[in-house]
Amino acid sequence: MKQTNVNWQPENLEDDLIKLIPLIKLDFDRIFAVAADPLIWEQHPTKDRYKKEVFQLFFDSAVASGTAFLMVDKLSGKIIGSTRYYDYKPDNSSIAIGFTFLAREFWGGLYNKSSKKLLLDYAFQFVDKVYFHIGATNTRSQLGTMKIGATKVNEFEKDANGEKQLHYEYLIEKRDWRK
């Protein structure tokens, strides 16, 4: 299944709980209001992403990717986080999902699972494999990724903040995806 011309930032990803809205440059203040919580980043490789100047780099990269989303709670209309696709490889029929963060009040519930289901359902229309790359110290994200059916398939070092840090790669294949 090789498709090279895929829109990885569709405007219609939503369910009863959450809506994913394409991230644009004008969204900075609204999403930074969520990201400014230091506890969100305590397990991430970039632990100081709650600082405006550090988050600005993350945000600019997300907007430039053309594959990032705001996560919106449909009940309240509140912006609760962000996520994105990245690393699309048509020849490998794969893409990655990541760079996800959620406001703490939405941790441990249905919101992460709901957003991942929307992203996975969409991705599996075009690819056979979806990867997740998670810092080795980010046990919260590792557990959340395993809860949706991903399996750890690799360990690798990645440069983060000028130093090599251990990361884990998780995989969900289309044939194994349960809706």
Task: Report residues per predicted region.
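A short, well-structured alpha-helix characteristic of acyl/acetyltransferase catalytic modules
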Residues: 1-57, 175-179
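Conserved beta-strand in the GNAT
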Residues: 70, 78-87, 96
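A conserved beta-turn-beta hairpin within the catalytic core of GNAT-like acetyltransferases
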Residues: 88-97, 111
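Conserved acetyl-CoA-binding loop-helix of GNAT-fold acetyltransferases
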Residues: 108-122, 143, 147
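Conserved GNAT acetyl-CoA-binding A-motif
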Residues: 125-134
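Conserved catalytic-core motifs of GNAT/GCN5-like acyltransferases
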Residues: 133, 151-167
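Conserved active-site alpha-helix within GNAT-family acetyltransferase domains
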Residues: 138-154
